[in-house]
């Protein structure tokens, strides 16, 4: 199993099935060699290498998504941090929901305090990716974290006697995904969040409605950054 591959068993560049400089000088040959390797064998090739070389190898693999998602989350996170978030968008777009959760757990918290600005930066970054797994992450477990995320960015009301107070929305951008829920953005950069909500409405409207109801009714967590 891939999760039983340990660093002490991993090859260095000299143990790759081709000279490391072929990644730049003979990329077609590297592609051909990688195409003959299983996902697990490719994972063994990638693990423990220099992050830039890791990214270059992934970009040459026909099974790049499978290999990326088979890597330990901390390995992919280290690659993204070392190469740079803006320069590793292709790798980020291939990360699995579980890997994204690991990134968010590390990046969105300072001690026990949630950092909304950090979260917004990652949501904005993922919006630049091609078909990222952000939507699948929203459909995964840890419902409360999604609620906390949305509470940091939104005020939500409905036009009924229980939830129609509409307090503190003066001057805030208004949006409704379905004509039922009135959403007011507490942040200036709302494009990415709006897009995510629309995608979620299209993918699974029940999940979106449950999240918006929770934003209305859940107490705001004391760990939210003021």
Task: Map each language-model feature to its residues.
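General marker for long, soluble alpha-helical cores
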Residues: 1-94, 98-226
């Amino acid at each position: 199993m891939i999760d039983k591959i340990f660093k002490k068993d991993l090859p260095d560049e000299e143990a790759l099935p081709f000279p490391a400089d072929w990644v730049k000088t003979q990329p077609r040959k590297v592609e051909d060699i990688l195409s003959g390797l299983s996902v697990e064998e490719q994972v063994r090739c990638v693990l423990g290498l220099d992050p830039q070389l890791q990214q270059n190898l992934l970009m040459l693999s026909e099974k790049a998504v499978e290999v990326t998602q088979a890597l330990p989350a901390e390995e992919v996170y280290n690659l993204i941090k070392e190469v740079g978030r803006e320069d590793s968008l292709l790798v980020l777009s291939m990360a699995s929901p579980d890997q994204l959760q690991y990134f968010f757990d590390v990046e969105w918290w300072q001690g026990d305090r949630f950092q909304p600005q950090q979260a917004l930066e990652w949501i904005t970054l993922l919006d630049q990716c091609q078909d990222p797994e952000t939507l699948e992450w929203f459909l995964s477990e840890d419902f409360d974290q999604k609620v906390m995320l949305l509470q940091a960015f939104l005020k939500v009301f409905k036009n009924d006697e229980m939830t129609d107070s509409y307090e503190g929305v003066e001057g805030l951008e208004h949006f409704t995904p379905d004509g039922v829920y009135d959403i007011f953005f507490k942040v200036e950069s709302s494009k990415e969040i709006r897009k995510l909500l629309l995608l979620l409405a299209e993918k699974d409207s029940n999940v979106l409605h449950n999240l918006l109801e929770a934003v209305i009714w859940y107490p705001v967590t004391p760990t939210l950054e003021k």
